[in-house]
Amino acid sequence: MIGKSLDIGSSVIRFFSKNFYTLILFALVLISAFSSIWLFYFEIVKDTNPLSSIPAHIVKTLFDAMVLMSPFFVVKRRGFVFIPLILLDVFCLSAVWYYRNYLDIIPFSSFLLYENLTPLLLESAFASARWIDCLAIVPTLMTGVLYKFVLQKKVQKERRRLWWPVIVILSVFVCFHIFLSVRDIKSKQYDSLTDRFVTFPNNILYFDLNGMCGYILYHAATSLLPQPELTEEETIRIQNYLDAYPRYADNIYSVNENKNLILIIVESLNSWVIGKSFCGEEITPCLNRIVNDSNSITAVHVLPQVKDGRSSDGQFMFNTGLLPLKSGAVATRYDDVDYYSIAKALKRRNYTAVNMTVDGNNYWNQAEISVAYGYDRNIDRLGGGTSVTDSVLMERAIEKIKVQKTPFFYQLITGTSHKPYNEPYRKTKLSGATEFPEEVRNYMEVIHYTDRCIGAFVDSLRSNGLYDNTVIAIASDHNQLLSPCGVPGYNDTEAAFIVANAGVKYTHTSVMGQIDIYPTLLDVMNCNDYAWKGLGYSILRTPVGSAAGWNGTVYGNEGDSLASRQIEAWDISEKIITKTRWLN
């Protein structure tokens, strides 16, 4: 017995002596990986769930770092380990920046959207950086320097494949997670060993439960495995859900028969700015005039229901009446579906549908998805090769509209008011509102600019004799979280929906969802004979007082009679998009 113990001890000593510098490099790589994952945990998970156990996550993070870096032992060129290490750093850093803007983990599919890497997007990302983010950069840089100038030649002399450390690491990792599952079963938190890996409310809490490796494995599996066909039970459920919607085909706003429709989707428009003045300057004088007009619809308590697709998710809801995916962007994952849409509803009446954007066709896959929505033309890159300002968009739109055969439907997608807000955009008196943080003041300035562009556009419609025969709908693509502020009335969580020349005066004072915009527009445009009215409700017909987020949270009146259906709509929409292909 003693002899065997001595033999084992001698073997361990020989292993360490033969692989001394290799193990030093692995320790440095391990520290670097641990540092990046810990940044992810501390800035995202701990911020979301203050009750998350730090000691438990120290152990999880250590195991995750060891597993992710374990290929180090089986490649003879140890320097290759910097490839997964740098990829891990990039993911963790991107996730932290994404979270600071959108309060969620960036989906892996977003890294394939290289077309979205515009200077504006990069500037927005860098604006989210903080000094603590060095945790994802400095350790890797220091490890790289030490490897290059101190360890490389010594590690190369020890070059050999070592399988048993990998086997030990993976075995301990699996045993650790089995232990966690057994513990959860004993505490009656879950019923089976696999429950913790498939039952979770959101991505962040999934990471909290299962760590980085569990998170990566789960999303890899769900992305690569084929989507199952719609079952008979699911088909019946969808049909029963749709059958319970109000059925109507009457058009109560006949004054809008064959009127043109212009839908302006405003980047990052928070509704609290509407009607507000500071330092003697209105933030949104144009929108204020529309809101106060006797022929307009106003809703300033709109719940943003966008998910990973952000701006493209807003467009998706307004165009199709479906909710976005809970993971990934519809615009890039399901761009080949022939959706029912407002463009197709109008084209039955000989409308021409045109989409215009300040960005390129490749941004959020505009070229493909606009075809799926039924647009006849998609006009992009108005500046030749780069994004343009909102003023250029509006000027070019007027040029096109003046010679456009009527009736027409134009969708105009703005972009100047995109984050970051590092400096005032065309400074006005609003910059003197020192009761607000600098970021909020700069935000007010750029929204003021976009509002002026919309105002000039509306004035051009009037001067060209087009206004009276045109309905103008204005909707926020999503809200924009800004610096915390205690000024009364400040709210960066609600979006806006406004319709000028609507044929009716209506102010929706309670909460509604972005999903309710599509059926409301059908109502306004006298398209109620179109079979597909979406998964929302026209606020002109139904007393909507609530809306549901993707995680099942109800906003507004939680006891609203529609609340349970609004929650279920997310699952119904997901199945329609991913399983039925929803062919028109």
Labelled PLM ranges:
Residues I236-N584:
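Solvent-exposed soluble domains appended to multi-pass membrane proteins
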